[in-house]
Amino acid sequence: MALRHLALLAGLLVGVASKSMENTVTRNSTAVINTQAEGTLSPPGLSSLPVVREWALTHTAQLPECCVDVVGVNASCPGASLCGPGCYRRWNADGSASCVRCGNGTLPAYNGSECRSFAGPGAPFPMNRSSGTPGRPHPGAPRVAASLFLGTFFISSGLILSVAGFFYLKRSSKLPRACYRRNKAPALQPGEAAAMIPPPQSSGNSSCRIPLWGFPSLGQSQGALWVCPQTGLPGSGSRPPLPGSPGDPPTRQGQGRIWLVPPALDLSWIWPAPPARPPLIPVTSMLFPVPETWGLQERRTHHDRADPQYLLLLEVQLHPRTDAAGLRQALLSSHRFSGAGSGGPKSQPVRKPRYVRRERPLDRATDPAAFPGEARISNV
C-alpha cells in the first residue's frame, strides 16, 4: 500500500514538473516573439527606414528601461520600441514615439504594472504580459511546485505510517485499555469455540469415578473428582448418597473393577493394619462380584484404622439412567465393564459443530472465563 502511494506521488511530481516546463517554454517563446515584433515595429512613415530599425535593435541592451526618467507626456525615447514595464509607447503627431509612464492620462491595467492608452490610428498597442522583464519566467514557479510535492509526500507518508503503527500496536496488545472496546467479545474461530465447550456425554456406557466413602480425607481433598451420569460435569460438588443399611440385600448382579492407585498394597494388607514400609507394586486391577460388596461394609467398620496413604479408587462402568442416584445403583448395575482387557473405558467420538453463532450483548464481561458461555454451538 505504501509503494502504491509513493508511485502516485512520483507521477504527480513528474506531471507538475512537465507542466511547469511547458509553461516556461511557452512564456519564453511568446516573449521572444513579442520582443521581435516590437523591435521590428516602426511608426508610420518610418517603416521603410532600415537605419532606425537597426539602431533600435543595437541599443536594446543599453536602454532596457528608457521611460524611467521620463516625466513629461511629450518626452520621447531614443528607442521607441523599448519601453520598460510600467510604461507604454505613444505615437506623436509628427511621427515620433514616446514612452509615457502609466498615470499620465492613461487607464491602469489589471495588475497595475501595465497600462493602456489611446494610441494613434493604425498603431498597434503593445501590452506587457508579464510583471517582470520580458523573456524571463516567474522566479516562484519551481519553488511552488517543489513545496507542493514535498508537502503532499510528507503528509501522505505520515498518515500511512501512523495508521499502520496504530494497527500494529493494537495487534500486539501494546496500547492502553482505552483503545480497546469493552462491550464486544473477541472473535473466536469455530475450532477455538468448540475446544472451550466440554464434550457431551455419550449414549452408550460411561465411566463413573467415585471416591471411597469410608475415608473422609479423600472427600475433603482438593483432588477428589466427582464424575457421574447424574451431574455430567467434573467438580460440580454433588456427592452421591450413601447406600442403605448394611442388612439390605442387593437386588441385581453385576461386575465392577477396582483400580489400585500407586503406591498401593494388596487388599489383605490394608486391614487390619498396613505394614511400616509398603512395597512398590504396579497398578493392578481385579474383578469382584457385586453381591460380595465387602468394600462398603468394611470401610464403614475399619475406616478409623485405615491409613489415608493407601486409598483405593473405584471405577465403575454403568449405563446412564435418570433414576440412577448414587453408588449403590452403580455397583448393582447389570451392565458389565466394556473393554475389560484394554484397561479403560471406551468413549464415542465427539461430533464437531458445523457453525458457531455468537451473541454480543452490550454488558458483556472481558473475563477470559466467560468466553465459553458467549459462544453458542449448534449441531443442526
UniProtKB/Swiss-Prot annotation:
Region (Disordered): 229-256, 336-380
Record has Glycoprotein as a keyword: yes
Subcellular location: Membrane
Membrane-traversing stretches: 148-168
Cleaved signal peptide residues: 1-18
Glycosylation sites (chain numbering): N104, N111, N128
Membrane topology: Single-pass membrane protein
Compositional bias (Pro residues): 240-249
Keywords assigned: Glycoprotein, Membrane, Signal, Transmembrane, Transmembrane helix
InterPro entries registered for this protein in UniProt: DUF4501 (IPR027888)
Ranges of Basic and acidic residues composition bias in the record: 356-366
Keyword Ribosomal protein: no
PANTHER family per the UniProt record, alphabetical: RIKEN CDNA 9430015G10 GENE (PTHR16247:SF0)
Name of the protein described by the UniProt record: Uncharacterized protein C1orf159
Gene that produces this protein: C1orf159
